[in-house]
Amino acid sequence: MGEGLLDLRSQLGFYKFYHHNPKNVLIHSIFVPTILFSGSCMLHRVKIYQSISLTAVLSVLFSIFYCLLYLPTGLLAGVLLLLLNLALIDHRVDLTFKQELGLFTIGWIFQFVGHGVFEKRRPALIDNLVQSLVLAPYFIMFEFLFKLGFMPRLKATLEHDLEIKQRNLRMQRQ
């Protein structure tokens, strides 16, 4: 199995290793988009150059990374991020900073509860902050696509890889 930065299997496998409990995956499926949305709203207030926001710059960078991992889903993620940016630019989102911060905070609280209560382990961001933050929305998109029946072989491969990692971890603990 490839372990490179641009290896889809290893990137999704890294994330799945920390997110395999169904209740925690459900929590993440709700609150990763909440964090992405509210964080994007807050970062849209930060202008990098004239009217170009930090959200726009990060969206482009995320989209490029996602496309390099796997073009079809990368394009889908890019379109979703573009739509979010267009909504922000066109002032279709009418939240105060306090509301955005509240959603952002609630999202993170639920993330940590999910890990502590259901996974019973620390979150992935403790081991790799940037990888976790960048991959979280993409992983959730894959989880949604898997639920719809797309890419069954990739889903099975990731589940098989997870079983091997968990078995190795149990053997190390003995």
From Swiss-Prot:
- What does the UniProt keyword field contain? Dioxygenase, Endoplasmic reticulum, Iron, Membrane, Oxidoreductase, Transmembrane, Transmembrane helix
- Compartment(s) of residence: Endoplasmic reticulum membrane
Enzyme class at the top of the EC tree: oxidoreductase
Q: What happens when the gene is disrupted?
A: Exhibits a defect in the metabolism that converts phytosphingosine to glycerophospholipids. Leads to sensitivity to tunicamycin.
InterPro entries from the xrefs?
Answer: Mpo1-like
Enzyme Commission number(s) from the entry: 1.14.18.12
Ranges in the topological domain labelled Lumenal: 45-63, 120-131
Q: Does the keyword Iron apply?
A: yes
Q: Which terms under GO biological process does the entry name? A: fatty acid alpha-oxidation; sphingoid catabolic process
Membrane topology per the entry is:
Multi-pass membrane protein
Superkingdom of origin organism: Eukaryota
Name the Gene Ontology molecular function terms of this record: fatty acid alpha-dioxygenase activity
Cofactor dependence is on: Fe(2+)
Please provide, in alphabetical order, the Gene Ontology terms of the cellular component aspect for this entry: endoplasmic reticulum; endoplasmic reticulum membrane
Query: What main location does UniProt list?
Result: endoplasmic reticulum
Mind telling me which residue stretches traverse the membrane in this protein? 24-44, 64-84, 99-119, 132-152
Which reaction equation describes what this protein catalyses?
A: (R)-2-hydroxyhexadecanoate + O2 = pentadecanoate + CO2 + H2O
- Give me the Cytoplasmic side stretches, as residue ranges: 1-23, 85-98, 153-174
What further fact does the record state? Present with 486 molecules/cell in log phase SD medium.
Q: Which PANTHER family does the UniProt record give?
A: 2-HYDROXY-PALMITIC ACID DIOXYGENASE MPO1 (PTHR28026:SF9), DUF962 DOMAIN PROTEIN (AFU_ORTHOLOGUE AFUA_8G05310) (PTHR28026)
What does this gene product do?
Dioxygenase that catalyzes the alpha-oxidation of 2-hydroxy fatty acids in an iron-dependent manner. Involved in metabolism of phytosphingosine and is required for proper endoplasmic reticulum stress response.
The Swiss-Prot or TrEMBL record describes its family as follows: Belongs to the MPO1 family.
Q: What is this protein called?
A: 2-hydroxy-palmitic acid dioxygenase MPO1
The record's gene field reads: MPO1
